[in-house]
């Protein structure tokens, strides 16, 4: 304990770089882009929330692909060892290497995989209404726009060069295509067997890969069950 009126500081302090983003003071665009560059964290939190409450195998597989994608990014960075932009103002970064950009690779993996899922995996809904198709197009455009803006933010905020975010986007897109093929051709046929494992049944892990529109399915099943219980309750009260 330091004596009253005296201050003692540790030898050094380090920030948590996972959420540490700097932007030029007074720059509104930089401020907004700094928040946008945190999108990968929001995506991961969203996935964890979905897995906890839905416990669906495809969602778990998607998150596993994102984790693998980040592992590949780390490996490439430490093989190429290209530094971040010269003269950059940032000292608190996760790694001194910048090729390829992990933010760009993450967001392009997420966006391209989601794009493929929306247009190839959900093709089974042949009777899709106009609003369903419009929603799919708008969502896809939003995902691709978000990936571009996050990539741009890393250049604007001087964390990466254009080439680093470009190759990050290319790597993420290629990884997304490869993981989508692996999921569809190898993992999806195994999902029913995995869902039947005792440990999966214990944790209520489920497989919805054969249901083209899970949201509509859950809505109709829940509504039917609620009406059935309401009828039973009404019968008991009579």
UniProtKB/Swiss-Prot annotation:
PANTHER family: DOLICHYLDIPHOSPHATASE 1, PALMITOYL-PROTEIN THIOESTERASE/DOLICHYLDIPHOSPHATASE 1
GO MF term set: dolichyldiphosphatase activity
Known pathway: Protein modification; protein glycosylation
Gene Ontology biological-process annotations: protein N-linked glycosylation
Protein name listed in UniProt: Dolichyldiphosphatase 1
Reaction catalysis annotation: a di-trans,poly-cis-dolichyl diphosphate + H2O = a di-trans,poly-cis-dolichyl phosphate + phosphate + H(+)
Locations listed in the record: Endoplasmic reticulum membrane
Signal sequence annotation: none
Family: Belongs to the dolichyldiphosphatase family.
Membrane-crossing residue ranges in chain numbering: 33-53, 100-120, 130-150, 162-182
Catalytic activity, EC: 3.6.1.43
Organism whose genome encodes this protein: Mus musculus (Mouse)
Job description of the protein: Required for efficient N-glycosylation. Necessary for maintaining optimal levels of dolichol-linked oligosaccharides. Hydrolyzes dolichyl pyrophosphate at a very high rate and dolichyl monophosphate at a much lower rate. Does not act on phosphatidate.
One matching Pfam family: PAP2
Membrane topology qualifier: Multi-pass membrane protein
Tissues expressing the protein: Widely expressed with highest levels in brain, kidney, lung and intestine.
UniProt KW keywords: Endoplasmic reticulum, Hydrolase, Membrane, Transmembrane, Transmembrane helix
Any one Gene Ontology cellular component term annotated for this protein: endoplasmic reticulum membrane
Disulfide bonds: none
Alphabetized InterPro entries for the sequence: Dolichyldiphosphatase_PAP2 (IPR039667), P_Acid_Pase_2/haloperoxi_sf (IPR036938), P_Acid_Pase_2/haloperoxidase (IPR000326)
Main location: endoplasmic reticulum
């Amino acid at each position: 304990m330091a004596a009253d009126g005296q201050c003692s500081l540790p030898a050094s302090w380090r920030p948590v770089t996972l959420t540490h983003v700097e932007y030029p003071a007074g720059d509104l665009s930089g401020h907004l882009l700094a928040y946008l560059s945190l999108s990968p964290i929001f995506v991961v939190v969203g996935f964890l929330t979905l897995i906890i409450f839905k416990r669906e195998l495809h969602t778990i597989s998607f998150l596993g692909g994102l984790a693998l994608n980040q592992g590949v990014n780390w490996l490439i960075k430490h093989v190429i060892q290209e530094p971040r932009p010269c003269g950059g103002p940032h000292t608190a970064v996760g790694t001194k290497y910048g090729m390829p950009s992990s933010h760009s690779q993450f967001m392009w993996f997420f966006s391209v995989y989601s794009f493929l899922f929306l247009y190839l995996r959900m093709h089974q809904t042949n009777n899709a209404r106009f609003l369903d198709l419009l929603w799919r197009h708008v969502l896809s455009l939003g995902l691709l726009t978000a990936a571009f803006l996050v990539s741009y933010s890393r250049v604007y905020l001087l964390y990466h060069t254009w080439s680093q975010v470009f190759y990050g986007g290319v790597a993420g897109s290629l990884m997304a295509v490869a993981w989508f093929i692996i999921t569809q051709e190898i993992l999806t046929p195994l999902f029913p067997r995995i869902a039947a494992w005792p440990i999966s049944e214990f944790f209520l892990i489920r497989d919805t890969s054969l249901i083209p529109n899970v949201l509509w399915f859950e809505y109709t099943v829940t509504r039917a069950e609620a009406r059935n219980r309401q009828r039973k309750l009404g019968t008991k009260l009579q």
